[in-house]
Amino acid sequence: MSSIKTINPATGEVLKEYPEMTSSEVSEIIAQADKTFKEWRKKSFSERAKVLYNAARIMRERKEELGKLCSIEMGKLHREGIAEVELCAGIFEYYAENGEKLLADKPLETPHGKAFLSYEPIGVILSVQPWNFPFYQTTRSAAPNLIVGNTIVLKHASNVPQAGEMMEKILLEAGAPKGAYTNIFVPGSKVSEILDDPRVKGAALTGSEPAGASFASAAGKNVKKSILELGGSDAFIVMPDADLDKAVETAVNGRLWNAGQVCVSPKRVIVPESLYPAFLEKATQLFGNAKVGDPLDPETQLAPLSSVKAREDVLSQVEKAVAQGARLVAGGKKIEGPGAFMQPTILTDIKKGMDAYSDEIFGPVLMIYSVKNMDEAVDLANDTKYGLGGTVFGTDVEEAVKIARRIDTGMVYINHVTGISPELPFGGTKNSGYGREQSIEGIYEFVNSKLIRVTTPDADY
């Protein structure tokens, strides 16, 4: 029988193995989720909120342990893992506190009688999530659906099975009934089979563009609502009036975040030609000299990538970029020894037509561009198939907002890399996917917005 392994990317050690579930086992899990849904949806908001509050409390109490699990299972810096767990607790609390208000009936104006929208749960949701934020991704999917009254069957990435198992245990301990949230151990090849199950009513995926296209096709074939959060190639535009030191520090720290394995990481830094030489020099010193090492060491700035394969994929992209004419300013090599470590890397002179110009590089690679003016910066920022996030960095905030309005993405941050907060929607445009998660937008994705009209027999049709 095939198994799913969890491997420490800093050492290469196999930590644990889980047998893959059979189709019949998964079918039984879906049956339980469907059965639980019929009762869970009847619970009051306060009863469902209690589970979310408890989950938040448990996560905060165990943040050191859970943060360490992020480190040993996918290589995240321990302090970043702890911050991720704190964020998850905040998301659970946000929906516990606001769910009933957000889902209250919405009156509609009508000339006769009255009408309103009633927001109702739809059933079992299949959620397929990636490894780069092993607790945040599952929380982002679980919290709004649980408060709505849906149930979740979650397939986590194959390299973070312990995190997937742990989230189910946390929610059960928090008081969720069996079947409200169930983690499954299956390969990606089983997903379309699950989407064929008529008991599954909705589908959410965060992952690569090819995975998203396949997932959406399988969901669409079954006429099921889906949301996708896919790749990104976020631009970080530096305005001419920017504080250079702060701009460099913000861009570099944003790219070091999670070893560059973040969909909204500032992958393309776009700098006015007047600031470019100084920016490049400062960025090379700060980024190129980042301390690489053990994710559990508080002094480490750059942890390993999630796997040796992930590192080799990134290095291959860097090598191809250089072969196609890009300039390698710093890094570009693997670090010898155990683990999936590589040097922080800076590329410049990237031109349209090169693979690096259009592809997402999911690792610690900073691409820096020089432009003549802000019009050119906006054109470059938009010249991508992706449309997830982005940054405009400058002193004149009013002008920065004007530039932000011209960027074709789902999110733009002023003077900060694209971030995450429970009350703010998260999602993109173009090939970065569709739909939104978090905030009021996220809670409406998997509900039946039912119109209820009260009128009389003689009213107009």
Q: What role is predicted for each listed range?
A:
Residues 1-113:
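N-terminal Rossmann-like NAD(P)+-binding subdomain of aldehyde/semialdehyde dehydrogenases
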Residues 12, 48, 70, 92, ...:
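Residue-level signal for inorganic ion chemistry
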Residues 15, 210-351, 414, 460-461:
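ALDH superfamily catalytic-core signature
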Residues 1-4, 266, 388:
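Short loop/turn microsegments at loop-to-beta-strand junctions
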Residues 16-21, 36-42, 127, 236-238, ...:
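Short, well-ordered beta-strand elements within core beta-sheets of diverse protein domains
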Residues 105-246, 371:
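Rossmann-like NAD(P) dinucleotide-binding subdomain of oxidoreductase/dehydrogenase enzymes
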Residues 11-17, 334, 341-461:
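Conserved C-terminal structural/oligomerization subdomain of aldehyde/semialdehyde dehydrogenase
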Residues 34-37, 41, 56-63, 67, ...:
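Structural signal for hydrophobic packing residues in well-ordered secondary-structure cores
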